[in-house]
Amino acid sequence: VRIGIVCPYSFDEPGGVQAHILDLARVLLEAGHHVRVLGPAGKDAELPDFVVRGGRSLPIRYNGSVARLSFGPHVHARVRDFLTEGRFDVLHIHEPNSPSFSMVALWMATGPIVATYHASSSGSLVLRFFRPVLRPMLEKIRGGIAVSEMARRWQVEQLGGDPVLIPNGVDTSVYAAARVPEAEKTGPVEIVFLGRLDESRKGLDILLRALTRIDREVRVTVMGGGRPRQIAGVDFVGRVSDEDKAAILGRADIYVAPNTGGESFGIVLVEAMAAGCAVVASDLEAFAAVCDAGSEEPAGLLFRTGSDADLAAQLTCLIDDREARLRLVDAGARRARTYDWTSVARDVLTVYETVVDGSMVSAR
């Protein structure tokens, strides 16, 4: 199958949607399909050959965060060339509600179109402005996918459609291979955080306040771009490569996700579980779903969103109780396997098969 994939967010900055798209493309290529990806990217971004660089992007506040999106005549030109030269059997647009390459591709393309919805909510003025234009465009989509029940519910309620639920995928083997055996771990318990440091909804300050309540010797590693703090006992390592991320998660004992909102999935929770971390997360609906919180053997501990006191209490329990920590690790490893790309990509291909009809995607 000849597959074209469109990403709205810049590949110059790391992000969950970008990582999802690149991983999906690699899995599809390994299965023998022809795949090309289009999205914003500057000339200096290190990207695989299957990515078509869409050029510069601008930071725009969108869905409670700051996303790097592209606008202007060059976007229309790049999309038209991508569709015309690609001769695709199916076009897979991610976040078609996003006013960047994705929205332009949806407006311009005709033929078999699949869309994946990642966002679960948005107070974006940009989206409100484009909503009247979006509704008729969304009718062109033949197959819809939502990465979480939250994303699916929001799409149905706000813009219509009936997407199927297919979660984000993770190459769990990469993180499992990085896992350091428990018997080889020495020193104090290591706690890890990953997220943009200057984005308040990622919750770093909640974790830092919680640490002041913990009267235990711990090692703390913070990954992510932004302004580091000067805090004794906390190692700010900055933005890291995928390899270094896997290595840090693989040696760590506890991964903390103190996010306060704007999350529809939580892919890094799955990565941490696969790497052998016990996961502690805020009780957002998306995180509760990933942690299988209502089951007899949950894959993560939840704390009240925004409560550094509650987070400190949960961390103290896991620091003191090694057996409880290891039970979470085992449950997390089992849970992570349900998100492996081998099953996720198979479900995505099934959606492709329902829309491909022998016609070719073209630009109007």
Positions of PLM-derived features:
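Short hydrophobic beta-strand element within catalytic cores of glycosyltransferases
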Residues: 278-281, 288
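Conserved donor-binding/catalytic core segment of Leloir-type glycosyltransferases
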Residues: 182-202, 208-212
